[in-house]
Amino acid sequence: MARTEDDSWEITESVGATALGVASARAAETRSQHPLISDPFAQVFLDAVGDGVWNWHSAPQLPAELLEIEPDLPLQMEAMVSYMASRTAFFDEFFLDATRAGIGQAVILAAGLDSRAWRLPWPAGTTVFELDQPRVLEFKAATLAEHGAEPACGRVAVAVDLRQDWPTALRQAGFDPSVSSVWSAEGLMPYLPAVAQDLLFERVQGLTVRASRIAVEALGPKFLDPQVRANRSARIERIRAVMAHVEPQREIPRTDELWYFEEREDVGDWFRRHDWDVTVTPSGELMAGYGRAAAAQVEDRVPTNLFVAAQRN
């Protein structure tokens, strides 16, 4: 499904469906013997939407026809769960470190099915602003309310498209740009054109003061590599062709059709230019640090993203 300038989506459609894939990985990690993170609400979202490809991680076994053409698929899926678990732990720790240091405002850009407002032990008085499409936020809040879950902080939903004037919406929701804040942009960058990425950071710059912090999952050096793109596309098409025959109800999305393959400024460089102290951790290093390095035969299937942590001077 190609993107348009004003596209929107339900939770099971387009960009919304990718949030279910991430929730599936977090649910699988939570069920594992030695989980790196605990997200008791991830499975709640999956149960609410019913069967789909996002339930692969809980399937007793994959179709034999699929394993014939992609024998390493179980290892690929295991590696992606480890990647998502490491990513989640990185952002969890980033938020808690900042708020325990006295920052009282947290902003989650493109919050999706992120349940941090409910599951993290936030310091008393913390306000968490969640920004995303209206239908995504409505689904999340309604589903968790039906489950009896309550936020562990002062949670504020800001229903707005990040391509629109979200800074005004954020301020109107109670955000105070005159005091320090902590931000996240997780799983967002490939869905933004290069110009929109720059605008996003410029707006964050205009809403932050000294000691504010931001963590970004930035695109790595291989994102635009033609061979990497071709290999990924061919692999997805092979899997889609088999699944259309054996399990047509579990359509494999062409996630890469939702991405913007454009040259863009390195995220770490952007923040350094704007007087932020920056630390960059490659995804492989992050995963290894958590004891979750991918198996050698599938490490090229794991995103080579960069995890950027920055504090404003």
UniProtKB/Swiss-Prot annotation:
GO terms of molecular function: methyltransferase activity
Pfam families: LCM
Alphabetic keyword roster: Methyltransferase, S-adenosyl-L-methionine, Transferase
EC code(s) of this entry: 2.1.1.-
Example of a GO biological process term: methylation
Annotated residues for binding of S-adenosyl-L-methionine: D132, D161, L162
Role noted for this protein: Exhibits S-adenosyl-L-methionine-dependent methyltransferase activity.
Family indicated by similarity: Belongs to the UPF0677 family.
Protein's recorded name: Putative S-adenosyl-L-methionine-dependent methyltransferase MUL_0706
Source organism of the structure: Mycobacterium ulcerans (strain Agy99)
